[in-house]
Amino acid sequence: MLGDGECGKTNLLRLVARGLADRFSTEELVFAVMDPRRGLRDAVPEGHLGGYAGNGKVCGGLAAGIAKELDKRMPEAVADSQALADGGWFHGPRIVVLVDDYDMLTAAGQQPLAPFLPYVPSARDIGLHFVVARRVAGAARALYDPFLQALRESGTSGLVMAGDRGEGQLFPGVYAGGQPPGRGRWVRRGEPTRLVQTAIAEPTPERVGS
């Protein structure tokens, strides 16, 4: 998810979190939230929240801890040949990693999500999912950092929201540009690019009136 300030990235992350938490139980799904601006601090219900990190150092530790669990889910760590044949070789909840302001986490060459790199190619099979947001400014170069490049190579979908067209091509044939908040171009491999408008995440009860 790419977009500059006030385009609706954080709102959409909150919307995704709420929708998944409403749909899946705490036994089925857990979130890891990486949130340097604290815009998602109350986005995930407590029962679904497996970990929260507000800076690059803590994010790196959280990612490393999750990686230990993911290692147990990899096919070579499973002895049951029938489970391998069926594709059901992991137990436990699906893990959704929500990342806002990825550009802030990777400032000064930091790579706090590097522990996930060995698992991105197998993410779908081991119950690992990423929703990552960063600004458009600097994205043309940043999309080739190891983690984002791994996501792109795995066939991840993308949403290009408001930003400077001068940043260049962000996905094949897709450039940022002026857009109202919440609007962007949805990019998915093998499908035509679509213009979409995202919804507004209503405030959680504890935030109403605050």
What residues fall within each predicted segment?
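P-loop NTPase catalytic phosphate-binding loop
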Residues: 1-79, 87-156, 163
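Phosphate-binding and hydrolysis-coupling loops of NTP-dependent motor/remodeling domains
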Residues: 12, 133, 140-210
